[in-house]
Amino acid sequence: MSTPTGLPALNGDVLSAINDMIGRVIIINTTDKKRYSGVLGAVSQDFDFGMQCVVEITKENENNLLRTESECRDKMVFHYSDIVDFAYVTQEIKKQHAVSKFVTDRQYHGDTPIEGEELQEWNGGEEDGLGGSIEDDVVVAGGQTAARRSNNHNNGTGWSVNDMFAANEKMNVVSTFKEDLTQYTTVEVVGTDEDRARAERLAREIESNSSSKFMANLENDDDERDLDKITRQEDFENGNGRKRNNNSFNQQQQQRRNPNIAPNGQPVNRRAEGLRGDRRNSGSSSANNSRYGAPAAAQQNYSQNQQQQQGQKGYRRQNEENDWQMAKGKGQNQGHDHSFRQQQKQMLDPRPNNNVKPADDKAQSATTATAAAGGSRVTDLKNWGNEFSIATAPKDQAPAVPAGNSGSAWNRGPPSSLVAKGSSNESTPPPTTNGEEAETKKEEAPSTSVDVAAAPVQNVQNDAEKHQEDDNVSVTSENDSVITSKSSSFKFNINAPEFKPRVAPATPTATTPVQNEYHPQQQPHPAMMAPQQGPPAPGMGMVPPHMGGPQNQGQPPMMMWQQTGQQQQGGGGYPQNHQFPIQHVPMQGVPGQMYGPGAATPVTVAQQPNQQHQVPTSAAGGQNHQLRDGEYREKQPLYMPYGPPQMVPVTSQQFYHSQYQGQMQQAAPYQMKMMPQQAPQGAYQQRYQQPQVYMMPPQGQQQQPRYQGPPPPQQQQQQQPQQQQFSGEQSRPQSHPNSQPTTPGPRGELPKMSGAPQNGNMQAESSSNASHSGSTSSQSGQRSGSPPGAVPPPPPPQQQHQQQQHPPHHAPPHVGAPPPQMMQQQQQHIQQYMVMQGPHQMHPQIPNYYQQPQQVFYPMIMPQQMPMQQNQHPQQSLMGERSDQGFPTSGYFDYRTMPNYQQQQQQQQQQMHRQNSLPQQFQGNQGVNPSGQQSGPPPPPPPSQQGTPRDQQHSQSPP
């Protein structure tokens, strides 16, 4: 097997390198120790190299840059057996000099052996040709010019222009070059000097023509210059005129006004105005409101004398007024505003040329037309106020009723000086051909009493308006006729009456009283509105007004019935600012126990939709009829327990700052949203309140004093069974957060009623509510004692029997006539002013027993209370804070100050065991914020005391 030779014997890398060397200059070393340089052209299968332009490298030609023709060979082939090695140069190796910006002669000639060499001085002469240009010719004697090489160096490094031309001439190539270069930069001029002079004269005439200049400015207008209100084009023209003062044409251009600049100094955008249509040749020109000049016939008005140039200031002011009128009329109706068309046409007209002089008789005849135009212009300037045209013509309506001068600017109208001639409105129609026409229009117009005051002014065209329309017509026009359209100008009626609404408001708004001027508007409740004067009809109940304060929240509901013989004073509404402002208000269908002639008939309570009313404040709301602010109400349904079956009205529930603890069952406190509990509790406005009133003594009866000693024995007998019944009703489990469950333990003997318990309820301990035991009198701030054996006697047998007899389950609690004893109690103790509890304060459970009148409460009179100290009353607010901290209570009623209430508290405190109650005098921490409590052992129980509340206060007060 033979070994492969040639290219197949080469590996891939060598083959790739050989392929890359094709076309490059390579150097080959042969076996005879010679070196050849040339371009590699091809490689054969036997690995033979074919080269072109081959040069043998010797020591003599090694450093030569160029090869001579004699040294080069076109093609040579080198066999593989003759090649020792081959290589090609990828990058030329250049001589590296020192890299420096500053190079000295030694660095340039570093390799030159200059040592020992003498330098020779060179002196150039004129014969060398140095210092001149290449085109310089040498003048030879005899006047002949001979081209010579200006740069005639011995080394022959360049050619002169003449040498090149001479060489071309030897080759029969003649150059057409001319030194003036006319055939390369200019064209041949056609025409003579006379033709050029005539063209310049025509150009000056065109430039002097105002129409041509106007069109040129319209085409070449600069939008940026129009936006600039400071730069004027005439400034540029004046600057150009200063440079060319010798030209009379430019001086005349300075005297003329620039048509692109308005008389008020602001540039005019003619492009937008010209695009609306070329109206310069349409219609006839008007002599009035000449803004940018008159027609060609009126150009003679402008003279060049000094007097008229000085009078241009006044003419400029007139142009400014015309500009303002034109601007006012642009946005208005252009269909029947003939003056606006004339103004717009004149705006596009060019300025007159002062240089153009009349050349024929037509220009002379136009002078008279100019004078007539000037007179018409003065007339139009006098009637400049008629330019205020409106877009639409008003309809024919009834004339306004002349009204007196009320003194207000609206009724007086504009000053008479602003009302121009012909713009004042006439109250009477102008004389017409048909005298009945004006009367017919008056009859067609509405003549109601309400619309007469607000009827717009009738538009009447008078003689001045007709004269104005005649003036708006062009003076030079003979075909145009007077405008007969109904378009009129705006006129202000000085005699127009004051504006009044056509329809009166459906619900008149009550005026705010002086003392409540900072309070929101209030409306009386329907129950407070008094009916017609006269005695009440039989069967109508008398509802004593309700004291709207939170102090009597836990009291039982009471109701008074007015006898037939009693008279009632009519009237209702806002409480007056005196001691007894509110009288009895009759209201039909009020739930509750009633005694009287109409008690046998069941009262029907009509279910009405709940209405939100802002009621006036009462005496319980604070002094000076102030409302409480910061209270937010939400509608909460609450059912009144004392109505007939299935006739339960829905009312709105009320919430107060704190949960006042009474002897009635209290519902769970309502957690109010966003109520500022930490803020000082002052006089705020109440919102969404139900009507709150209180009852005052009947007419002709004296006021009962607050403290009058112990009640009579007969009254005590009536009060004791009622108290037991009331205590039994309150013994149900409390839902207040301060309440605590019953704790078993030893306790004292409780008094037992001889009758059966009502509604099957057991007699519960009266100490279920822990916060009740801590309540004391707001006058003294100390506990009121009672004798240890102060147990009320049992009620009379008649009353016990009355309590045991229950009505049917579905019958109303007040069916039938009241017992004789109740009638006798009401007649004897009619002076005991009782308080009615509102429906929102009644406990939500419906009992089936008779609600006995509790004649143990005193009238809700505003007593002057003593200042309340810190931690005096453990009243808890809705958010768990102490409501008595900073809460002004002077002037508020407190049901705990009544003597009978103190006796009930004393009895409960004696019966309640110490293990099942809060510590005496606020020492307990259950359900009360401990921040306002005082630490310390509880004080010993006070000795039993007897007597009136005032005697107990003196006995308990420290010496």
UniProtKB/Swiss-Prot annotation:
Disruption phenotype: Sterile, however growth rate, size and fat accumulation are not altered in response to a restricted diet in contrast to wild-type animals under the same conditions. RNAi-mediated knockdown results in embryonic lethality as a result of cell division defects at the one-cell stage. Cell division defects include polar body extrusion failure, abnormal spindle positioning, chromosome missegregation and cytokinesis failure. SMART domains: LsmAD. It comes from the Eukaryota. One of its GO terms (biological process) is positive regulation of female gonad development. Residues 246-260, 282-313, 504-528, 697-707, 715-725, 766-788, 822-831, 867-876, 902-911, 923-935 have a biased composition (Low complexity). Residues 789-798 have a biased composition (Pro residues). Residues 226-235, 270-281 have a biased composition (Basic and acidic residues). PROSITE patterns: SM. One of its GO terms (molecular function) is mRNA binding. Residues 13-92 form the Sm domain. It holds the Pfam family SM-ATX. Interacts (via C-terminus) with szy-20 (via C-terminus); the interaction is RNA independent. Interacts with pab-1. Interacts with gdi-1. Belongs to the ataxin-2 family. The C-terminal part is necessary for interaction with szy-20. This is Ataxin-2 homolog. It comes from Caenorhabditis elegans. The lineage of its organism: Eukaryota, Metazoa, Ecdysozoa, Nematoda, Chromadorea.
